[in-house]
A protein has these predicted regions:
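Glycine-rich beta->alpha junctions and the first turn(s) of the following alpha-helix
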Residues: 1-76, 142, 151, 158, ...
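Active-site lining segments that contact anionic ligands and/or coordinate catalytic metals
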Residues: 12, 24, 94-96, 115, ...
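Residue-level "hotspot" positions that anchor or transmit function at local structural transition points
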Residues: 21, 60, 93-94, 98, ...
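Short alpha-helical scaffolding segments that buttress acidic/His motifs in well-ordered protein cores
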Residues: 44, 85, 136-140
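C-terminal helix-coil-helix/basic helical segment that borders enzyme active sites and/or dimer interfaces
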Residues: 45-59, 72-105, 118-121
Length: 168
């Protein structure tokens, strides 16, 4: 391969350039999951406020409130993890552990938030074509591309085990 065609521009830098690219993409997936969760929360609350059961808004029922609260807390945790991974990435390092953790948590989180949103909509969420139904289907993809959840788990565990071994 000629010097002009080397990935990374310098011999020996190709892997680092490739890893930088995939880790950038994984950070982007995590951030997208956070954005999707925010949208889902912003869709579920008005529905819960407007839908009545037993002469009471769904939003006033403790079980529904718990689902809304859980969705927000998980979204906020994923946002914090993603922002920290991005901050470390922007510093020039490749924080693979933090990025895999953020991508794994955020992609699993958005599926749970989508499930909560669909649960709040009830049968209408399953039978009718609406934004939450579409997002419920679409969020499943986040656990697959740029490395499945199982690949992220493996990367996280391998990194932690290596770090522990290196300390000894």
């Amino acid at each position: 391969v000629s010097v002009d065609d080397l990935v990374g521009g310098v011999e020996g830098n190709g892997l680092k350039a490739a890893l930088r690219g995939i880790n950038h993409a994984r950070t982007h997936v995590a951030a997208t999951c956070v954005g999707q969760a925010i949208r889902l929360i912003n869709e579920m609350i008005p529905f819960a406020l407007g839908r009545k059961q037993f002469n009471k808004a769904l939003a006033d029922m403790p079980t529904i409130q718990n689902m809304i609260a859980d969705s927000y807390v998980e979204m906020n945790a994923a946002r914090s993890m993603t922002l920290e991974a991005a901050r470390l990435f922007d510093s020039g390092d490749i924080p693979a552990l933090e990025i895999s953790s953020a991508k794994y948590f955020a992609s699993e989180m958005v599926s749970r938030v989508a499930d909560n949103a669909l649960q709040i909509l009830g049968g209408a969420g399953y039978l009718e074509d609406n934004v939450i139904t579409r997002m419920y289907r679409d969020t499943r993809l986040f656990r697959l591309y740029e490395g499945t959840s199982q690949i992220q788990q493996r990367a996280i565990a391998k990194s932690l085990i290596k770090n522990y071994r290196d300390r000894k």
